[in-house]
Amino acid sequence: MNTRRFGIIGEKIAQDYLRKKGYEILETNFYTKRGEIDIITKKDNCIIFIEVKTRTNLNYGTPAMAVNSNKKKNIKFVAKIFLSLNRLKEHEIRFDVIEILIMEGKCKINHIEGIM
């Protein structure tokens, strides 16, 4: 299975998890020339921008470790565009990472809130 297809599976798992936790999914795969945000949700008065990282092992560290400072900068930039386009500037905002680890037929989800 290629990396992109595997990532899509992880994003679907994350979306199901978020819905069960009471998040309203506003948009998925929001693209701009500068980058992309995997999932944008709303809960209470907070807009949450979520990066999903899916892995099958921990050989290169935890999935969240792949969200480096450059990636964080791009996510923040893209988030500003989304907020402006959708006139949502009055909301609180938060940036999260959801780690999906799929090993030996089992799926582990780790939701890290407020990573930036």
Predicted segment positions?
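Acidic-basic catalytic patches of nuclease active cores, encompassing PD-(D/E)XK
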Residues: 1-28
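Basic, glycine-rich
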Residues: 21, 31, 100-103
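Domain-level recognition of nuclease-like catalytic cores that cleave nucleotide substrates
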Residues: 84-116
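Short acidic/glycine-enriched loop/turn segments that link adjacent beta-strands
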Residues: 32-35, 106
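Mid-chain, well-packed structural core segment of small domains
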Residues: 60-88
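Conserved catalytic cores of phosphodiester-cleaving nucleases, focusing on short active-site segments
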Residues: 37-59, 67, 75
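Residue-level signal for inorganic ion chemistry
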Residues: 18, 75, 95
